């Protein structure tokens, strides 16, 4: 069994009507924001890579836009993106204009209705896989634009073809090496630049080293042109599949040693 869960948090553009009617932007302005903030076709990359892989991973996908809620934020004051109005429930747009006029109580309702059940479901899947095979590797799949957005905290950082987001506790040197090897032919690779860290469910964060995680932030112009797959799409999916196969092989080797 594959130890891998591909997490696809930002691929959807779906915004429920009851959420959309409280946003301060609509029409072309909202579509522009979705174009900027959606990790377009990362869901298709995950699906294509899964089909290519020898051992199929689990895919956990957010079916709602990150403008509804962002599953990868900390739901408290420790979230650094709160400073730009982009915690779990965004109050500002990517160019730092108002997105919502929302109270703390209203924000908490969204957290309770969307964020908490989502987090609990992913946490349950990780727990289930740990009980089944004793290890989990989360591939946190994202894409990002070639030009920095106003909300970004590290606008001056390099913007490589691939940013590997790592965590000191949950990302081993071996996992980084496997990712580097899988993507070695697709351009330059940096660590934690321009985005830092990787997703781990809060119940395991900083506590269980059996949960490994690495973020793949793929620069959009390497596989998309105006939101449409380019000639780089299939090689990118193939690289993800190569990483899946390498992780499954390592898992099999570890299992045979136990």
Feature map (PLM): residue ranges:
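N-terminal catalytic or cofactor-binding beta/alpha core of small enzyme domains
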Residues: 1-138, 143-257
